[in-house]
Design a protein with these regions (language model features):
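Mature extracytoplasmic or organellar-lumen-exposed domains after removal of signal/transit peptides
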Residues: 1-131
Length: 131
């Protein structure tokens, strides 16, 4: 269950916290960013990544590739200077956020490939899988 939560958490950050405001290159949707009123859209992404990294470390302290992938994604999020994600209407800012999204998806793939076998488990069903 915890391994599935790790993968689902990464998917949520990439698809919802980033994907919704990212929209498309031609039509970004910064108004759909989470935590606009509190100014925490980017902070929520960064903190989620740090919490998920801690979970991954507790599941498998020897998961060096996963830890490196998390460190890369967290580093990217910490270099963005757009707390509300409202600068993504600028093409360069949009691309930087898309690069972060890709890094998070790569982190998920790495965690599934490295931590799952170390624990002897496979990715399970989650409530967002649909029918």
């Amino acid at each position: 269950a915890l391994f599935t939560q790790l993968a689902t958490g990464l998917e949520f950050v990439a698809d919802r916290r980033i994907g919704r405001p990212l929209g498309t290159f031609d039509k970004p949707r910064p108004d759909l960013a989470e935590g606009i009123a509190s100014g925490r859209a980017l902070a929520n992404i960064t903190l989620s990544l740090k919490a998920l990294r801690d979970l991954a470390l507790r599941l498998d302290p020897d998961s060096a590739k996963t830890q490196a992938a998390f460190d890369h994604a967290i580093g990217l999020s910490e270099t963005l200077n757009d707390p509300l994600l409202d600068h993504i209407t600028d093409p360069q800012a949009w691309l930087k956020l898309e690069i972060l999204q890709q890094a998070i998806r790569a982190t998920r793939d790495t965690a599934i490939a490295e931590i799952g076998p170390a624990l002897g488990v496979e990715l399970g069903f989650n409530s967002q899988d649909g029918d």
